[in-house]
Design a protein with these regions (language model features):
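A cross-family phosphate/adenosyl-ligand binding-site feature
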Residues: 1-119, 125-398
Length: 398
């Protein structure tokens, strides 16, 4: 996902975290964005305009009446050029001025003139942030359509411990990507995605599971959220970072996955069953650790609920997309799953193809639909996720 052709305007105000915005500017440039920076006069006490000019290739604006530039009405030209404005760190002073329409420097003037999406990342002492005046000002900005990125908690520059830290750079960038990187062609579509493995306990120490890492399902959830969908991510235990802009529903067992999916199914428009749900579980779970003994051990297993087998025949308006992982007869087995479970589409994965399968960042998939099959080349799981969403948009006529 990139920002080619997009202009990001960074508004840097006078907080100790101002220096962190140099890394944000650099990262945005690597994503292809055209980055402009406006600093308040106080911000120049923490980091120099030259730093941003070197990183962005543009003059860093500070003084509203600066004459050292090609003549334009600068506050209007920057306001029109920007696809998104991020004010970070946003001090209590700048937040108060923006909330009340005060435009007494270049930054607040541009913010007032701009019609693009505006993001604000407060960063200040905990007492200042939690002061009712600041909270009212943030609420006012939200009423006017600003997006407030919540501060993080931790040790602050003043040595206090509490909220008020500037969010991590990757969080700020993720908010920018979510705002402008992709057209919102899935706006209003309610999507549920399952991802990762399940774990079926044998005793208090051991469980049955599989090799799924959840990467494919998480990629689908992130891509759908970036395109404006209302996404619920139902996932088993994984080592992945949560997907922002989604409802996160962690589960452990196949039974819990079944309950989480079926309870939400009526209010779902599209369901992606990308999770590797256990087909079997131990018939009984021992209360204590099973001790090693001489000879073999036999573990009786029982079937877990068949989620797609249950909801497939009951679907009304929903689009059901299953996933299959095969080691042979990929198309035949996946086509049988499509028909048996009344699915609209199956994304079939061949575990034996190089670059596909568990734990890797690439995949090779085949789309199985009632109309036939379409094999995709090796690509990143992020690109596979977008290809899946494009296919569903086409088939649903969204």
């Amino acid at each position: 996902m990139d920002l080619n052709g997009k202009c990001v305007l960074l508004g840097v105000s006078g907080g100790i975290a101002a220096y962190k915005m140099a890394n944000v500017a650099s990262a945005l440039r690597k994503l292809g964005a055209d980055v402009e920076v406006i600093m308040t006069q106080n911000a120049t006490q923490f980091i120099t305009p030259l730093t941003f000019e070197t990183l962005t290739g543009h003059k860093c604006m500070v003084d509203t009446f600066d004459r050292d530039f090609k003549f334009e009405v600068t506050h209007i030209s920057l306001a029109k050029k920007a696809d998104v404005i991020l004010v970070a760190p946003a001090t209590a002073n700048v937040i108060a001025k923006m909330a009340h329409g005060i435009a007494d420097d270049m930054l607040t003037t541009v913010v007032l003139a701009a019609k693009c999406p505006k993001l604000v990342a407060p960063a200040m002492n905990t007492g200042m942030l939690e002061n009712p005046i600041t909270q009212d000002n943030l609420a006012t900005l939200e009423r006017y359509g600003f997006t407030v990125i919540p501060s993080e908690s931790g040790v602050l520059a003043c040595k206090d411990v509490g909220s008020g830290r500037l969010p991590k750079e990757e969080v700020l960038i993720e908010h920018i990507l979510h705002t402008i990187a992709r057209p919102k062609d899935l706006a209003g579509v309610r999507i549920a995605v399952t991802a990762g493995p399940t774990q079926e306990a044998l005793d208090p120490v051991r469980y049955l599971t599989n090799h799924s890492t959840g990467k494919m399902g998480y990629a689908v959830a992130r891509a759908a959220a970036m395109r404006g969908a209302e996404v619920t991510l139902i996932h088993g235990p994984t080592a992945l970072q949560p997907v922002r802009f989604t409802e996160d529903v962690p589960i452990t067992t196949a039974q819990q996955m079944y309950e989480a999916v079926t309870s939400r199914f009526e209010d779902t428009d599209v369901l992606f069953m990308a999770a590797a749900v256990a087909d079997y579980r131990p018939a009984a779970v021992a209360n204590d650790k099973i001790k090693k003994k001489d000879g073999d051990m036999s573990i009786p297993l029982e079937r877990t609920p068949d989620i797609l087998g249950t909801i497939g025949p009951k679907k009304t308006h929903q689009f059901l997309c299953g996933f299959s992982m095969e080691t042979r007869d990929l198309v035949e087995n996946s086509s049988a799953k499509l028909a048996k479970k009344n699915l609209d589409m199956v994304v079939a994965n061949n575990l034996k193809v190089a670059g596909a399968g568990f734990g890797v960042d690439t995949n090779v998939v085949t789309f199985i639909t009632p109309d036939g099959t379409r094999e995709l080349p090796l690509m990143s799981k992020a690109d596979v996720a977008d290809a899946i969403l494009d296919e569903i948009l086409k088939r649903r006529g969204l």
